[in-house]
UniProtKB/Swiss-Prot annotation:
Cellular compartment(s): Membrane
Keyword hit for Transmembrane: yes
Protein name per its UniProtKB record: Membrane-spanning 4-domains subfamily A member 4D
UniProt superkingdom: Eukaryota
Length: 225
């Protein structure tokens, strides 16, 4: 996603009780929650819900003016199915920001990913709708045609918000492969001291023995074998 993930290393004694291990895991999860909360999910979720209601209202206004057959976005009901998904994803983003449990963050990540895909589809439909009616609608119904342009812009903004929430949710729940848990053995290391070894001289090699007197390796008088 964004840059390289930072490596987090935790050292756990091998004989540590389960309570200490759970505390360490809890601390690591708290760091992940901080990553998610840095993305301001409550604020972004509120903006998602607001965009959804605006798009829904604009779609109704265009339909009530009886010119909906001229707008491709309204014919395909993009303001309605897109708005429903935006409300759902925005509500989950707010809930995950209030109670950032792992299940809530993963749910927010999944729904915002789907919402971003639908936002792309709605944006493409909106662009085609605006381009196809740039000569007809803007001359006959400039105010209504401007609403279609506004819906397209809001769909693009919704895409950016959904991708942002998904990115921070992924950093908190998925991208944790760089975290390393090091377990140390509980038993202390035992140092064993080996007895000293007596080094004896090596006999000369065969080629060196030719130049050595024969009685060099014989026992001298008074020596003990």
């Amino acid at each position: 996603m964004q840059g390289l993930a930072q490596t987090t290393m935790a050292v756990v004694p091998g004989g540590a009780p389960p309570s200490e291990n759970s505390v360490i895991k809890s601390q690591m999860w708290n760091k992940n929650k901080e990553k998610f909360l840095k993305g301001e999910p409550k604020v972004l979720g509120a903006i998602q819900v607001m965009i959804a209601f605006i798009n829904f209202s604009l779609g109704i206004i265009i339909i009530l003016n009886r010119v909906s057959e001229r707008f491709m976005s309204v014919l395909l009901l993009a303001p309605f199915w897109g708005s429903i998904m935006f409300i759902f994803s925005g509500s989950l983003s707010i809930a995950a920001g209030v109670k950032p449990t792992k299940a809530m963050i993963i749910s927010s990540l999944s729904v915002n990913t789907i919402s971003s895909v639908l936002a792309v589809a709605a944006s493409i439909i909106g662009v085609i709708s605006v381009i196809s009616g740039v000569f007809r609608q803007f001359r006959s119904q400039p105010a209504i045609a401007s609403l279609d342009v506004l819906m397209t812009i809001l769909n693009m903004l919704e895409f950016c918000i959904a991708v942002s929430v998904s990115a921070f949710g992924c950093k908190a729940s998925c991208c944790n492969s760089s975290e390393v848990l090091v377990v140390l053995p509980s038993n202390s290391a035992v140092t064993v001291t080996a007895p000293p070894m007596i080094l004896q001289p090596l006999p000369p090699s065969e080629c060196q023995g030719k130049n050595v007197p024969e009685n060099l390796y014989r026992n001298q008088p008074g020596e003990i074998v």
